[in-house]
């Protein structure tokens, strides 16, 4: 399996990713193949517009029941709404993954120039 070079986020979340405020994302197994130490391009899900680049720090298993306030804060959504959204996106899936990342240094410079 090849190493992913892109990741998408809902457009409403991309300002948080691009500012470095959002540093995790919760995905299912099909989207868990990111590799720590790699850099990936961030695109909006809706329009495929490139937003920035992030460096993958970790990919760790996460059970649905382990989703907590920290995850909700990172997703900029209340915990009950986050759990409902995850169930909508990944119905009947308990085995999830939390991908931890940071804004790539070159991305922050480019964003400040805009």
UniProtKB/Swiss-Prot annotation:
Residues 8-93 form the ASCH domain. It is an enzyme of class 3 (hydrolase). InterPro entries: AC4CH, ASCH_domain, PUA-like_sf. GO terms for molecular function: hydrolase activity, acting on carbon-nitrogen (but not peptide) bonds, in linear amidines; N4-acetylcytidine amidohydrolase activity. GO terms for cellular component: cytosol. CDD domains: ASCH_yqfb_like (cd06552). The active site is at residues 22, 25, 75. Its EC number is 3.5.1.135. Gene3D superfamilies: Hypothetical protein (2.30.130.30). Keywords: Hydrolase. It comes from the Bacteria. It catalyses: N(4)-acetylcytidine + H2O = cytidine + acetate + H(+); N(4)-acetyl-2'-deoxycytidine + H2O = 2'-deoxycytidine + acetate + H(+); N(4)-acetylcytosine + H2O = cytosine + acetate + H(+). PANTHER family: UCP029143 FAMILY PROTEIN (PTHR38088:SF2). Catalyzes the hydrolysis of N(4)-acetylcytidine (ac4C). Belongs to the N(4)-acetylcytidine amidohydrolase family. This is N(4)-acetylcytidine amidohydrolase. It comes from Vibrio cholerae serotype O1 (strain ATCC 39541 / Classical Ogawa 395 / O395).
């Amino acid at each position: 399996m090849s190493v992913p070079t892109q990741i998408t986020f809902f457009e409403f979340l991309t300002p948080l990713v691009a500012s470095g405020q959002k540093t995790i994302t919760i995905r299912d197994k099909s989207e868990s193949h990111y590799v720590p130490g790699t850099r990936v391009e961030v695109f909006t899900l809706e329009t495929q517009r490139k937003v920035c680049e992030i460096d993958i720090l970790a990919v760790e298993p996460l059970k649905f029941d382990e989703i907590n306030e920290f995850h909700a804060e990172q997703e900029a959504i209340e915990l009950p709404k986050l759990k409902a959204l995850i169930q909508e996106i990944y119905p009947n899936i308990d085995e999830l993954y939390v991908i931890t990342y940071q804004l790539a240094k070159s991305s922050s410079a480019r964003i400040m120039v805009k």
